[in-house]
Amino acid sequence: LELLRASVSAAGHTLAAQRVEEGQKSIVVRRLCEESLTKFLTYLNPSKIMDSLMEFDRIVEQELGKSFSNPIRIRIIVHCGCALERAVTRTPLVYEDSKKDIDTQKLAAIQKAVKVFEDALKLHFSEDELYFMAKMI
């Protein structure tokens, strides 16, 4: 019984340490994305959209059942922030590759996650923007 308690306690500490490490990685990702978006965006304030962007990332990872590497997270979050600006300026990207080659599970995860922006910011992405995001992940 003592061995079981010690094992459970050690597992709990390991899990807690992993959560702290993940939290620190999220802070780093958030800061890097916010700094990048400050350079790229003209109309949107990155500090005001970061919560929505981080929630978008969380939902996509949850829907796909995987954790993205930090470089992929940064790329998708920055792309998404720029896509929000394109939604504001009504200058969406045009996806010219074959849409039937896109992973439908990834596209469905993106479609669910963008509801964050529709609800919080009343901004909608073009279908082509969604295809670009699905291709990125």
What positions do the PLM features span?
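A cross-family "folded-core" feature that marks the main globular domain of proteins
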Residues: 1-137
